[in-house]
Amino acid sequence: YQFNIGLSTSFTGEDSLDIAIDSGSSSLSPMGTTMGFDSGTKLNVDGVTYTFPVGGATMVVGDSTDISSTFTGACLYSAFTDATPDDCGTGNSLGVAGKGVTASLSYAFDSGFSLAGGISSPQSEIVGNSADLYGVEAAYSADSYGVAVAFVNSDNGYLPETTYWGVNGFYSFDLADLSVGYETEENGGTDKS
């Protein structure tokens, strides 16, 4: 079984403090994957995130928060199971998670263009000797189409760094939507697609 609860509150009406609490068993799901919070029956705080405006931009800080939480993206596909990703195949770039303490900022222009960036670290010291992760994204969305591109770098601490480039896009027809994505990975000088 699994039990999730999301708590949300605001102090000013323009901000949001969100806390996710999870509990569940460690048995395999019908798709053959274990739940991400295999901890028996105890309650675990899965994430604490605070979102607030900074001028015309939106800032997100938190623990166990995705860097991509402020990324616009351009993928309309939504899976009905947890085993199938919702990121059009760009989960390491446009759908990048965080490694612990995270800060992310985005700005949306009136023209449909948006910019976002973030940094995350598994330690309390961001940009130290730990395996920090940072990424930037640019996106454009109109009524019936959109495109987004992202760059993510994971310095992996003392190991060779890994970089990701991802692009995804969508086009909306009258009866259906088409979403596509492509991502590349370079790990210590070795390219993968």
Question: Could you say what each language-model-derived stretch is?
Answer:
Residues 24-26, 76-81:
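Flexible, surface-exposed loop regions and adjacent strand-edge segments
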Residues 1-62, 66, 85-119, 130, ...:
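Beta-barrel outer-membrane channel/assembly domains of diderm bacteria
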Residues 71-75:
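Outer-membrane beta-barrel and related beta-rich outer-membrane complex signature
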Residues 133:
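Active-site substrate-binding loop specific to GH73 endo-beta-N-acetylglucosaminidase modules
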Residues 121-123:
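Right-handed parallel beta-helix
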